[in-house]
UniProtKB/Swiss-Prot annotation:
Gene3D superfamilies xrefs: Structural maintenance of chromosome 1. Chain E (1.10.10.580)
Keyword entries, A-Z: Cell cycle, Cell division, Chromosome, Cytoplasm, Mitosis, Nucleus
Function statement: Cleavable component of the cohesin complex involved in chromosome cohesion during cell cycle. The cohesin complex is required for the cohesion of sister chromatids after DNA replication. The cohesin complex apparently forms a large proteinaceous ring within which sister chromatids can be trapped. At metaphase-anaphase transition, this protein is cleaved and dissociates from chromatin, allowing sister chromatids to segregate.
Protein name: Sister chromatid cohesion protein 1
């Protein structure tokens, strides 16, 4: 479009200029310094190939950008050289005087951060070695620190105000029952260590005797003493230091007879019920209690190593968590990789998919009912109307008998069969009841078909078969044309009432409606619409000539008096627009025959009627005439009455 071959060439003089105009970041510093700006300007001013104005503008933009880059780089280089020269060659500078031998020179590398900045290379999936990385992965138990928190604090054992001094130290409880640690963090005990733990617990249990009696009993037991901070400054502080008072919790006894000590002891080993405590109260009374021996007490069995925490499972090497191997996708290649021209043309010409029936729901419920009831199967089983009575519908279906169609079955045999009902016979046509004559004479039929009299009054154009108005003979007798005089008209019987209505009063136009008369018969109405009427186009010429004569008679009186007449006086007797149009058409007919001349000074203005060249020849038209052929034709010819639209 705008490119030239020398511009797109990689080694061309304007290649870098074009690239600088469209992709400035693509050029390096070396390429910018290599570009010869004067030579590029010369190539643009005097090109070897004619270039478009837009291409020249792009090249000039590239030259400006390259020149701007060059000046920027030159300014940066000169500034850097100036700073170095200013630091190294200032006045009186010398290494011996200014800088000692062991002094450290503080160098500012802020300007060289970008130069010495090391970018970490991108990590690619191809460099990922799973075996090398997974070899350094340790177990979760090996890298997790052991918890040294005393979980016995949760039971408020170390609280000085929660007990009566016989709970023991926390280190003793840890020694007896072990620290409450998560099972996943406990080391797996060996059989030798388990025996030692059991031996230590038996010795500690013999030193501290625990006895279960009633809920309300008070037990004094010997064992390791603990300073009772609650009773040191109160009454009861005279208890022996080696004696501890323990009151069992009645709530725990009611729930099942398990006290706090029983909870701890039941975690590791069964409760031992053979301890006896001999205590002496402050009154010197000795109490000797017999231990409560249950009847069936099973001997304690040694703890198995499986009762402690098990070895943590290696989730990665479990059978159920095996890595699912993905199936290699099978590459499917088409057997035919190319489409032939014949197949392509056949596919383009195939329009069978557009000829399918569209299966869409009808837009309205009425259309839906028509689609259902208009089906062929529905029509062969159901009547045309809706029948809600099931019994009546079944009777209708019984009458539906199918017969095989026989081509030799003629219509005569069909009419003679019993299944042909009289109601199916052809009825008489309405014009046959009126005794209309269907036989039309050949000479009249050759001239053209009968014309509807209702539309004859509206016709404003001249047909080829009609006699033009200008060819009329405006002689002394103003007779009809020659063809009209010798035309034989078939006599048409007319009723007296209708004939009286068809007579026109020449003194004053009387436009009557034949359909408004109560005396008109059906035959007269059909004749008005063209049924049985034998009138032709030639009768229309006589009709228009009679109207023109009537208009000329109206106008001649005003012309003889004042020399001119107005068209508004002619249309004063018109009752509707149709009658006014007929009068205007008759006026134009007279003007065309030069009987009168019309003039209109402005659009939609008054039409002035003046006498024409043949006015005197047409004026005797208004005088009485002897009875002749013309009067005979006038009396014998029926005129169609005017009807309002």
């Amino acid at each position: 479009m705008f490119y030239a071959q020398f511009v797109l060439a990689k080694k061309g003089p304007l290649a870098k200029v074009w690239l600088a105009a469209h992709w400035e970041k693509k050029l390096t510093k070396a390429q910018i310094f290599e570009t010869d700006v004067p030579q590029a300007i010369e190539e643009v001013i005097r090109p070897k190939v004619k270039m478009a104005l837009r291409t020249v503008g792009h090249l000039l933009l590239g030259i400006v950008r390259i020149y701007s880059k060059k000046t920027r780089y030159l300014l940066a280089d000169t500034n850097e050289a100036y700073q170095k020269m200013k630091i190294n060659f200032r006045n009186g500078f010398s290494f011996e005087v200014d800088i000692p031998e062991n002094a450290e020179i503080e160098e500012d590398f802020s300007n060289f951060i970008d130069k010495y900045n090391i970018t970490v290379p991108e990590f690619h999936d191809a460099d990922y070695n799973e075996q090398l990385i997974m070899a350094n992965v340790s177990r979760r138990e090996d890298i997790t620190m052991k918890e040294t928190v005393n979980f016995n604090v949760e039971f408020n054992i170390d609280a000085d105000f929660d007990g009566f001094g016989d709970e023991g130290e926390s280190w003793q409880l840890d020694h007896l029952y072990g620290s409450v640690e998560p099972l996943s963090l406990r080391p797996t005990p060996q059989p030798e260590s388990l025996m030692e733990v059991e031996r230590d617990r038996d010795v500690a249990a013999n030193g501290t005797e625990i006895s279960r009696i009633d809920a309300d009993s008070v037990i004094f037991s010997e064992g390791p003493t603990r300073p009772n901070l609650i009773f040191d400054n109160q009454e009861g502080g005279n208890f022996m230091p080696e004696m501890n008072l323990k009151v069992e919790n009645q709530t725990l006894e009611n729930d099942g007879g398990v006290g706090p000590a029983d909870m701890f002891s039941s975690m590791i080993h069964p409760v031992r019920e053979h301890a006896v405590a001999d205590v002496q109260n402050d009154d010197g009374m000795d109490f000797d209690y017999q231990p409560f021996e249950p009847e069936n007490v099973e001997p304690s069995r040694p703890q198995s190593p499986e009762s402690f925490a098990l070895e943590p499972l290696d989730v990665e090497h479990m059978e159920g968590r095996k890595k699912r191997q993905r199936k290699a996708r099978k590459l499917i290649v088409d057997a035919e990789t190319m489409i032939s021209n014949d197949a392509f043309r056949e596919q383009q010409e195939d329009f069978s998919d557009t000829m399918r029936v569209v299966e869409m729901a009808p837009p309205t419920r009425k259309m839906f009912n028509l689609c259902v009831s208009g089906d062929l199967q529905h029509l062969s089983r159901e009547p045309g109307c809706k029948m809600f009575n099931r019994e009546l519908l079944q009777r209708y279906r019984r009458c539906l008998v199918t017969r095989e169609f026989d081509l030799n079955y003629t219509m005569q045999e069909l009419s003679d069969s019993s299944s042909f009902t009289p109601s199916m016979e052809a009825q008489a046509e309405p014009w046959e009841d009126l005794n209309l004559n269907e036989d039309i004479q050949e000479d009249i039929q050759a001239q053209g078909p009968a014309v509807d009299e209702f539309f004859n009054d509206v016709r404003m154009d001249d047909d080829d078969d009609r006699q033009p108005a200008q060819e009329m003979d405006f002689g002394d007798n103003f007779d009809f044309p020659q063809e009209v005089e010798h035309q034989e008209c078939a006599p048409i019987p007319i009723q007296s009432g209708f004939a009286g209505e068809n007579k026109e009063n020449e003194d004053a136009e009387d436009w009557s409606d034949p359909f408004g008369s109560s005396n008109s018969s059906r035959r007269g109405q059909l004749e008005a619409y063209g049924f049985g009427n034998t009138s032709t186009y030639k009768e229309d010429d006589g009709k228009w000539a009679k109207r023109a004569k009537h208009i000329l008679k109206k106008v001649s009186a005003d012309i003889e008096t004042s020399g001119q007449a107005d068209f508004s006086s002619v249309t004063a007797t018109a009752k509707n627009r149709k009658q006014a149009a007929e009068q205007f058409y008759s006026l134009l007919t007279l003007a065309k025959s030069q009987a009168i001349s019309v003039d209109q000074s402005e659009p939609y203005g008054e039409i002035v009627i003046r006498p024409g060249a043949n006015f005197k020849e047409a004026c005797p038209l208004s005088s009485p005439k002897p009875m002749g052929l013309g009067n005979t034709m006038e009396n014998s010819t029926m005129r169609t009455p005017m009807r309002p639209v």
